Regions:
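Extended aliphatic helical segments
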Residues: 9-10, 49, 56, 93, ...
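Residue-level detector of functional hotspots within protein domains
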Residues: 5, 24-26, 34, 40-44, ...
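Detector for methionine-enriched segments
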Residues: 1, 58-59, 108, 197, ...
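Non-catalytic extracellular/periplasmic "stalk"
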Residues: 24-205, 209
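Bacterial Sec-dependent N-terminal signal peptides
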Residues: 1-27
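Catalytic cores of peptidoglycan-degrading enzymes
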Residues: 199-336
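Generic secretory/membrane-interface signal
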Residues: 9-11, 174-178, 226, 305
Length: 336
């Protein structure tokens, strides 16, 4: 691919307070590519922070002189590579934001999760733009790695919670399979929300954090290790739980390990999860808006006390929830 012009500018600085007072500075960059048959503009967060995500928003402008024998609509994929490897670490497919006002403009968005176990190295993004099955454009975008530390904790379980944690029943297996099928669903039409999300509770009392490396100490003397996929808020039973963003309820039911549980779809492949509830106030199929009351907190399922577990999943992988409290889709930013 021939680049006539390529511009990178630091557009936005976000100071994010991480665990243990660790300050993470996330930068956002823009780029422009001028081609013979189209102009490509994009914006993305260029800081690779373990446990967060990378989102790329892209506008493809096709001139009015576009040849009719070539497809107007383009498809694109996003891949994360480690420079020392030949296979991508993560990948995703761009989907329409529904914001394009001109027929010759096509705006797309894609997000990919970043494992909390990513190690310091040289990484880059590869965007592949296709026009039908013929022409392919490849765009390489640089990334800057920023380390993040995660907490470690040991959680002693009584006999009741030990039984829940070690439950190998077919019922629990079916519940896990059902949830995984939902989280693996990427519905390109599910563009329900592009604005920054909001916390599901007004409380700021965290009892556990996303990415905690856990050891569960069983009542029988045995133990197991686990990774904590969300944030736990230590709030009294019956506290209000609100939708973090606009979306559709795709699960609202009892699960052996997470108690009364709700899952909401916000974007293609992006879901919020709410666990250990005492009461559910929505049902599967309901549409919700940011701040809608959806449940009351509790201590159902595997819980050592009353709390709300809030979790975010992108393409099945857990992502640090606070990432989505920022303008992660770059909504309202003029980048083209």
């Amino acid at each position: 691919m021939k680049n006539i012009k390529k511009i990178f500018v630091v557009l936005l600085l976000l100071q994010i307070e991480a665990l243990f007072g660790q300050a993470i500075t996330q930068t956002t960059s823009t780029a422009k590519y001028q081609e013979e048959d189209c102009n490509i503009y994009l914006i993305y967060n260029d800081s690779l922070v373990p446990g967060d995500a990378i989102f790329v928003r892209m506008m493809i402008q096709t001139p009015k002189t576009h040849k009719k024998d070539k497809p107007l609509e383009k498809q694109a994929t996003l891949q994360l590579y480690r420079k020392s490897k030949t296979k991508p670490i993560e990948s995703g497919v761009f989907y329409s934001t529904g914001k394009s006002k001109k027929a010759t403009n096509q705006e797309m968005l894609c997000g990919i999760p970043l494992s909390s176990f990513l190690e310091k190295d040289d990484y880059y993004l590869l965007i592949t733009v296709k026009e039908g099955n013929d022409s392919v454009k490849e765009i390489n975008l640089p990334l800057t790695f920023q380390a993040r530390k995660f907490n470690s904790e040991t959680i002693p379980l009584d006999s009741t919670n030990t039984a829940i944690k070690t439950d190998n029943s077919s019922a629990r297996a079916a519940q896990i399979e059902k949830l995984n099928e939902i989280l693996a669903t990427v519905n390109a039409d599910a563009v329900n929300a592009l604005k920054p999300m909001a916390s599901p509770t007004t409380s700021t009392r965290y009892t556990s954090w996303f990415g905690d490396r856990r050891v569960y100490a069983y009542s029988n003397g045995k133990s197991s290790t686990s990774l904590h996929y969300g944030n736990d808020y230590g709030i009294p039973e019956g506290s209000e739980v609100k939708a973090c963003s606009d979306g559709k309820v795709v699960l609202a039911e009892w699960r052996n390990s997470t108690g009364w549980s709700i899952v909401i779809e916000h974007l293609p492949g992006l879901y919020s999860l709410y666990y250990h509830l005492s009461e559910m106030l929505v049902k599967e199929g309901d549409t919700v808006k940011t701040g809608d009351l959806i449940a009351k907190s509790g201590k159902t399922g595997l819980a050592t006390g009353p709390h709300l577990h809030w979790e975010m999943r992108l393409n099945m992988s857990a992502v640090r929830p606070e990432f989505f409290l920022t303008n992660f889709t770059f909504e309202g930013i003029n980048y083209y």
